Amino acid sequence: VAKTPTVEHDLREISTPKGALRYYDCGPESGPVLLFLHGSGPGVTGWRNFRGVLPTFAERFRCLILEFPGFGVSDDFGGHPMVTAFGTVSPFLDALGVDKVHIVGNSMGGGVGINFAIANPDRVGRLVTIGGIGTNIFSPSPSEGIRLLQEFVEDPTRQRLVDWLKSMVYDQSLVTDELAEERWSLATDPATLDAARRMYGKAAFAAMNSAMAASDRPLPWAVMHKLTVPTLLTWGRDDRVSPPDMALIPMRTIPDAELHIFPNSGHWAMIEAKEAFESTVLAFLSRGNG
């Protein structure tokens, strides 16, 4: 069993005009830099998304876990947390004096990573996404996991949180009382809940869909042909938040993309398929000098 790294309480911060960005920094200082970008959802943090795989990656890489604003660790910058997240990567890396990174982005973090890599192709070596990007082709939208997330955000109860957590995983036994309690305490923090409602409340979701329908700008999945860095798309076969049919457009349109689907795994492939995820991603990151 992988030993939990000793960086749990080594939370650092940088100041920005909008508030503090907090992050973890571990692994060899002289190693290539691997930036982890977390997903969204009740009680999420970068640390919780990636603490399990950190010991493996920190052996070879300087690992940075950025905590996005509005999720209870970094300050809340206001606005739509997903939109805010897009603007944090460049100033974060600039403040640390880091020129180039590999990126592992989970769900929303994958979208942030793609956006950053399209805008800054010279700053990204290789990019790994975990579910959550693309668009539904055959599966209904919103997905089961997103609907359960909306229900929790509208009216938070422990049972709704457990129902949502169970939609995140293939192995239902992973949703323990301990996990639910850990998520509940942060998810129901008033400021964090307010930020979640700005993103996943039914009114916010409807407003976002209306804005996208009225916009002349292409939707995120329609600009992925502009992504030039080598990209590994990873997915859980049994993902009920972002079903695997969402991978088809990114797989076809990203020029240098490969797709790896893990069996018996839901939206948290890096947790449910930990060893296979680690070996697959390490092999990809170790290929070439990019």
Please provide the spans of the model-predicted regions.
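Flexible "cap/lid" loop of the alpha/beta hydrolase fold
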Residues: I114, I118, G125-D163
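Short beta-strand/loop motif that positions the catalytic acidic residue
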Residues: L227, L233-W235
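Catalytic active-site module of serine/aspartate enzymes centered on a nucleophile-bearing elbow/loop
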Residues: A257-G290
